[in-house]
Amino acid sequence: MRRKGTKPSTACHQEEGPPPSQDGAHSDEEMEQPAGEAESAAPAKPPGEELDNRSLEEILNSIPPPPPPAMASEAGAPRLMITHIVNQNFKSYAGEKVLGPFHKRFSCIIGPNGSGKSNVIDSMLFVFGYRAQKIRSKKLSVLIHNSDEHKDIQSCTVEVHFQKIIDKEGDDYEVLPNSNFYVSRTAYRDSTSVYHISGKKKTFKDVGNLLRSHGIDLDHNRFLILQGEVEQIAMMKPKGQTEHDEGMLEYLEDIIGCGRLNEPIKVLCRRVEILNEHRGEKLNRVKMVEKEKDALEGEKNIAIEFLTLENEMFKKKNHICQYYIYDLQNRIAEITTQKEKIHEDTKEITEKSNVLSNEMKAKNSAVKDVEKKLNKVTKFIEQNKEKFTQLDLEDVQVREKLKHATSKAKKLEKQLQKDKEKVEELKSVPAKSKTVINETTTRNNSLEKEREKEEKKLKEVMDSLKQETQGLQKEKEIQEKELMGFNKSVNEARSKMEVAQSELDIYLSRHNTAVSQLSKAKEALITASETLKERKAAIKDINTKLPQTQQELKEKEKELQKLTQEEINLKSLVHDLFQKVEEAKSSLAMNRSRGKVLDAIIQEKKSGRIPGIYGRLGDLGAIDEKYDIAISSCCHALDYIVVDSIDTAQECVNFLKKHNIGIATFIGLDKMTVWAKKMSKIQTPENTPRLFDLVKVKNEEIRQAFYFALRDTLVANNLDQATRVAYQRDRRWRVVTLQGQIIEQSGTMSGGGSKVMRGRMGSSVIDEISVEEVNKMESQLERHSKQAMQIQEQKVQHEEAVVKLRHSERDMRNTLEKFAASIQGLSEQEEYLCVQIKELEANVLTTAPDRKQQKLLEENVSVFKKEYDAVAEKAGKVEAEIKRLHNTIIDINNRKLKAQQNKLDTINKQLDECASAITKAQVAIKTADRNLKKAQDSVCRTEKEIKDTEKEINDLKTELKNIEDKAEEVINNTKTAETSLPEIQKEHRNLLQELKVIQENEHALQKDALSIKLKLEQIDGHISEHNSKIKYWQKEISKIKLHPVEDNPVETVAVLSQEELEAIKNPESITNEIALLEAQCREMKPNLGAIAEYKKKEDLYLQRVAELDKITSERDNFRQAYEDLRKQRLNEFMAGFYVITNKLKENYQMLTLGGDAELELVDSLDPFSEGIMFSVRPPKKSWKKIFNLSGGEKTLSSLALVFALHHYKPTPLYFMDEIDAALDFKNVSIVAFYIYEQTKNAQFIIISLRNNMFEISDRLIGIYKTYNSTKSVAVNPKQIASKGLC
């Protein structure tokens, strides 16, 4: 059953609307209105209701370029194809059904009526965004499958799968990598729908953009022909009847792409109409102002006549006043002649006197300024030196004090440490001594017991040897008993002697300390005295050597200054010579490379055989490197040779011919004078520089030759600027760019490219120079360079000597100042030590021991020592005897008795040490308290002295830092001032010398000037009288002001020449003429305001004319742009139209086997006025309009047009629903064969019930319906036929 459809050209079927909601869904009512219908619903605005105020450039720039073809028509180009369609619960398809796969070229869908064939097309329309009504449904929810077996389904989905392929032979093809994608649309029960691209949620706009980018024509729906619509394509009206209606003209315009120009053409047309209206208004204003201006012209002329008369009268007054002044000046001249005779001989003296006076004033002022400056700097240096000397003295004093205080602090620290250790030691003496006594007593008792044991052991040993040593042993025992008595006496005597000695040492300790301090003080006094003596001698030596060093330093500095100046002069000379040598070498190199013709001509010039030769034109001038390429590209005459005249040029030509050297072109300067007037500056577009003005020459005569070569060629930065500048309305210019591109006055363009010309003209003018001259310059450069090196070496030696002398001088000064400052400190130290020695000597006397007490203690020590010595001597004798006996016994007993005896000796020795330790401990306990009190007093005194000394050290360090900072500042200031002092002193001496010379000259001139003064005073009185009269007449002339007349510039009061003044013989006649003119002026009564009013109207008239010209120019620009766009639209349309109509004719002839069809213009002069008519001549019939054809003929005509449009603008996909319904068997076969054979770069999916259509297809998609659900099956007819299955 066929469906009623609408023609695809009247509306677009895709969705457009507001953005989707958050869930991405669209409602059927809100979102599925076609864009074309939305446009038709909006009322058209009248052209004058809203004016487009964009500039012409903005309007033209807003025009998009012609749309590119969506896909290529040539073989092997990538194209889009549908692989298969997946329907899920869509219309008659229950569940998920896959339709396909479709063939890459020709697929037919077949099946019985009502099986769901057209639902295949509907599924694609659904995905492509068509409204529900276009898919034969009232709303989207109706598209969801509903049958007895499948109820309450909530949604339906259709997926169309695409891929891009490259065709190969036969049915084979290559799939482009990553080109597969699918577009799906899902509709819900609430009539909303969502789109997905390859599973990702998208808007319909994204889907539309994607499909358009792959060549699917969603805008004109050429890919889709539904039931009954095939003939409606050809039946469109020639042109749309309304603005939003679409006929054949609009249909073709959209396909060709020139429709994009319609809106800009309308805008420009409206702007031209409005500008014409405005221009009419401006023209009327000009005429009105011109009429008012003409009405004021009579009064204006009368006023001008009056002003002219007054000007004539003022001129006459000017003449008579000048005559009177001239007469007085002649009288003054006579007197002046007398005056000149008087002081003619003294004129030079007066001038010299004035000059000397001015010089004297200037020099006196300069001397005062320099003296002030010099005094200020000198005073500043002296003040700083005094400050530094004082600071250095303070520094030495503080350092000496700091040194003494630091030394004192170190000694006190050591003393304090010793005193503290002594206090701690004395504090622990009683306890330690008691502990020692207890421990020693215990140890002594233990040793006594041990000795008894060892003696018993020894006795046992000796008993064993008794028989052998019995006699000796008895004798030894007797001696030992005697020794035991002696040992007790010895220990007691030794203890008494050591106690007495300790008491004597403690009693004499303070006195011994005082004696030690006195000895050290005397040694320090000797050291200070020797240092003072050495420094006084050093000061005397420095005072002798310092002046000699200073004198030597001055001489070296003078020599260094002289060498420095010589070095500067020589370096400057060497630098200049180096530049000259480099320029000479460059010039020589360029001269060598200029060619044999130019070399021969230049050689003739140098030899003098052909005078008047200047040289190659390019070598006679220079230009900035920026313009090198420009002038090298556009000026062919740079290689011409410049000569003074045509005769010289002829001589050069004859010379070249005679010697067969070559040919050359010459410029004769005597023929170039015709260009002199045109060489002046000119006004150029955009102030573009003229190349001629950029050329620099040494000889101004050559400029005419350069103008001849360049004329008014301009140089632009780039080709865009060059194009703007070259094509001016009133004149065309010759322009060259910095890249060498040239635009001639004729409009032709040349130059540019990858290789450009450069180097034909240098950045400096080249002089002729020989190899000998270059060698001479190089020799001179080498000589001066060696001399500069020698002076530099001498300078370095002098600089080193000056540095050494300055160091030596500075060291002497510092040493002198330090020694001078330290002498006082050493003297004070010497005095201090003397006082200290006296104090220490008094202290020695104070601490001197009592002689009686000392003698008593010494006598005690002596008595105890004698007692000890006497007892010890006796004990020693007994002990020696015991030892002898013991040794004898030992010798007898050999080694048996020796070990035991050694043990016993060791114990005896330890017992002696214990006795001595107990004695010392007892003495220490007795003297500990007294010594502790003295030691604690000493610690307190030392700590107080340390605090005072530390405070003194910190104060001295702070003072020393302040002194150093001040000294550094003073030194820096002094150095800065001393650096500027020599220059100021030199300037002062020079000024004084110059001033002395001027004073001597001035005194000589004053004597001569005095005698002349008296004579001149008499003459000056007469001249003054005449001058006062001249001033009066000059004042009268200054009052004379001429009136400006019309637009002429105001005339200045003429100054008569001497000849004109002498020609005035009768001044009274001029006076009479002035009186006559005054009478005429009094009779006239003009309106002088008429001139200003006329001028005002004239300015307004010119302003109105300028406005008229401006709007006329703007109107012309818009009108020209309007005409250009109309022409462009026509050209684009006709180019596409001829391609389409020719292909239409070819297709129709093929489809009908002899018929003819064409698209013809209703109005051959203007295709856009009446539109396009589709005319057809079926085979063996006459030409007919499309409306008069049969159904089959209309179908064939429409298909021919569809295929012609495909040829012009290919579309990858075509869907056709029973396009062969109205065709007979023969025509169906022709159409099917045409689709199969001719259209190989597109995919056709056709629904057909005609066997001669679907039998020829590459793939059949069978549609059948069972159990209220549509199914499909795909087969390849050719494969089935090849297997013999049909």
UniProtKB/Swiss-Prot annotation:
Pfam hit, one: SMC_hinge
- Mention any one GO cellular component term assigned to this protein in its UniProt record: chromosome, centromeric region
Per the record, residues carrying N6-acetyllysine are 379, 677
The UniProt record gives the binding positions of ATP as 111-118
Q: Does Transport count among this protein's keywords? A: no
**What are the Phosphoserine sites (modified residues) in this protein?**
21, 27, 40, 141, 980
Kindly list the places in or outside the cell where this protein is found, as annotated in its UniProt entry.
Nucleus; Cytoplasm; Chromosome
GO BP terms, alphabetized = cell division; kinetochore organization; meiotic chromosome condensation; meiotic chromosome segregation; mitotic chromosome condensation; positive regulation of chromosome condensation; positive regulation of chromosome segregation; positive regulation of chromosome separation
What this chain does, per the entry, is described as: Central component of the condensin complex, a complex required for conversion of interphase chromatin into mitotic-like condense chromosomes. The condensin complex probably introduces positive supercoils into relaxed DNA in the presence of type I topoisomerases and converts nicked DNA into positive knotted forms in the presence of type II topoisomerases.
Give the domain section of the comments. Answer: The SMC hinge domain, which separates the large intramolecular coiled coil regions, allows the heterodimerization with SMC2, forming a V-shaped heterodimer.
Subunit description: Forms a heterodimer with SMC2. Component of the condensin complex, which contains the SMC2 and SMC4 heterodimer, and three non SMC subunits that probably regulate the complex: BRRN1/CAPH, CNAP1/CAPD2 and CAPG.
Official protein name in the record? Structural maintenance of chromosomes protein 4
Source organism (scientific name): Mus musculus
Q: What is the lineage of its organism?
A: Eukaryota, Metazoa, Chordata, Craniata, Vertebrata
